[in-house]
Regions:
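A long amphipathic alpha-helix within ATP-dependent nucleotide-binding catalytic cores
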Residues: 174-222, 245-261
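Active-site nucleotide/adenylate-binding loops and adjacent lid/helix of ATP-dependent enzymes
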Residues: 3-34, 42-200
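Basic/polar N-terminal segments that are highly enriched at the extreme N-terminus
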Residues: 1-2, 263
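Helical (often loop-to-helix) elements that flank the catalytic cores of nucleotide-handling enzymes
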Residues: 237-243
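A short, terminal or domain-edge coil/loop segment
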Residues: 95, 260-263
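Conserved metal-phosphate-binding beta-hairpin within the catalytic cores
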Residues: 164-170, 205-237
Length: 263
């Protein structure tokens, strides 16, 4: 049976109409529409929770998607840095806690890149080189684990979209993060990317769809930035239909059903 595609929407007062909640959901909506999916708009997870079946897909944010996965006893997880791809990191990465960093000047002044070890935690990753960079990272009530890495001097970044062991597209995103970057002047090394993919397909528990973010450093190295799961992911200009297929591949793998959009 074909499942439904649930689309998170919001009411736009200016236009007096329901619109997709963000542009990623809009892109996926157009992609699923092209493949003749039945699309059902909704506002809150509570509105669809009881009706939601394994065959269905929801276009929503990470935490909301997880509520639906949990209904079926599924907890999605992809490591940021899979073991088989560690040779491509080009930097040391280790675990620490946010409080231990804020207490130690040697740590908070070192210019390390710090991000929560658990995705849904308080802040997005950033470079910490002074005590004020820690503002907004702490949470006095709880000390939590962070991943710390040596800083990279990044010139350009790309998101490689992988569906069923193939790179579907590679989209630049560095300038979204930092307008001063001239990422278009750089290119990654295609041979390194091919080697990354050879390692990727040797990874036993690999996802059927995900993104592999890569970068080129100012000294010309092509390196792995991190992996991201595909069930709720920034599209960065990926063509609508490929974006929808990527989402479907991962949802069907996670919920153990046939991927109806794998054609």
């Amino acid at each position: 049976i074909m499942g439904k595609v649930y689309l998170k929407t919001k009411y736009d007062n200016e236009m007096k109409m329901e619109i997709p909640h963000n542009h990623n959901f809009a892109s996926a909506m157009f992609g699923f529409r092209e493949m003749a999916a039945e699309i059902v708009p909704y506002h809150l997870i509570d509105d669809i929770y009881d009706d939601f079946k394994r065959e269905d897909i929801a276009l929503d944010y990470i935490d909301q998607c997880n509520v639906l996965f949990n209904k079926f006893g599924v907890t999605p997880h992809i490591p940021d840095y899979p073991d088989v791809l560690k040779p491509f990191l080009g930097r040391k990465i280790w675990k620490d806690t946010i409080n231990s960093i804020s207490r130690d000047e040697n740590k908070w002044s070192a210019g390390y890149f710090v991000k929560p070890a658990v995705r849904s935690k308080a802040f997005t990753g950033k470079t910490i080189s002074s005590i004020k960079d820690l503002m907004g990272c702490g949470n006095h009530a709880e000390d939590y684990e962070v991943l710390v890495s040596e800083s990279l001097d990044i010139a350009a970044e790309w998101r490689c979209f992988i569906t069923y062991d193939e790179i579907i597209d590679v989209r630049p995103y560095g300038m979204i993060i930092d307008k001063s970057r001239k990422g278009y002047l750089y290119h990654y090394d295609a041979q390194v990317l091919n080697s990354m993919m050879e390692s990727f397909v040797s990874w036993e528990d690999r996802p059927m769809a995900c993104s592999m973010d890569i970068c080129v450093t100012k000294d010309g190295r092509t390196l792995l930035v991190e992996f991201n799961d595909a069930y709720s992911l920034g599209a960065y200009g990926l063509a609508d239909i490929y974006y929808a297929k990527l989402i479907s591949a991962r949802w069907s793998q996670l919920l153990g059903v046939k991927d109806e959009y794998h054609f």
